Amino acid sequence: MAQSAKPEIKVVPLETSSSLRTLAYCALKRAITEMDIYGQLEPIRLDERQLSQKLGVSRTPIREALTLLEQEGFVRAVPRRGIYVVRKSKKEICEMIVVWAALEGWAARSAATRATDEEFKALADLFEKFKDEPLSDQMHEYSAANIAFHQTIIKLGRCDLIVEMTQNLFIHIRATQTVSFRQDNRAEQSISEHLAIIGALKARDADLAEKLVREHTLGLASQVEKYGAFAE
C-alpha cells in the first residue's frame, strides 16, 4: 500500500447545551468514522490535549468519551503509549463483511415490502450522474454514492437495531471500497449490481433483492481477501 499523508482527525468546537461527554463522544465518533483509517501504515494516535483544544473543552469529557469509544471497539488504550484508532486485520475485515452482507440482505428483504416508491427513486437517483461519463473520471463521487447506497438500504429496512449494529461495522467496511474499486473493473461491475438491486426492490421482489445484496457484498469480501493489503 502506498504511503499517504498522515490522517488528521477533524473536529469542531462543541456547544454546551448538552452533556459535554455526550457531545465529545458524538463528535469524536463522527470524526473517526469519516477518517481513512487504512490509508497509511502508521498507527493513528489520538492526543487528549490536542482534542481538548480543538473541541474547546477540558480533558475530562474527552477522556470519558474515549472510554465509551473503547467499549464500542473504535479505539484502544495502549499502556504508556496512548489511545489509538482500532484497525482490523484482513481476516477480521472479511468476517465483518460477511456479517454486513447478512444484515444488509435482511434490510433489503424488508425494504422490498416496506419502503415507498419515492424512496426507491431516490436510491436510483444516486447513480444518474454516472451514466454519461466514465467512472474512472468520477471515482471520488462514485465512492460517496456507493456509501450512500448501502447506508440507505440499511435504513429502508426500517430496523433500528440493524442500523445501530452496522454503524460500528461501517468504519471498517467503507475503507475496503478503495481496495475493491481498483481491481478487475470492480467499480463498473458494482454500479451494474447496484442497478439490479434497485430493479428488484422496485419490483417488490424480496427474495431477489436479498439474494442480490448478499452476493454483491460477499463479492467485496472476495476482493479484500485477494487484494487487500491489511494486517494479517
Task: List each model region and its residues.
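Short linear motifs at protein or domain termini
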Residues: 1-105, 109, 113, 226-232
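A generic short alpha-helical patch detector that favors 3-5-residue windows
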Residues: 20, 95, 99, 115-122, ...
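A short secondary-structure junction motif
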Residues: 31, 35, 39, 130, ...
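Hydrophobic residues in alpha-helical segments
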Residues: 32, 111, 134, 201-202
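A ubiquitous short alpha-helical element
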Residues: 89-93, 108-115, 133-137, 157-158, ...
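Conserved amphipathic alpha-helical segments that form helical-bundle/coiled-coil interaction surfaces
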Residues: 117-178, 192-199, 208-219
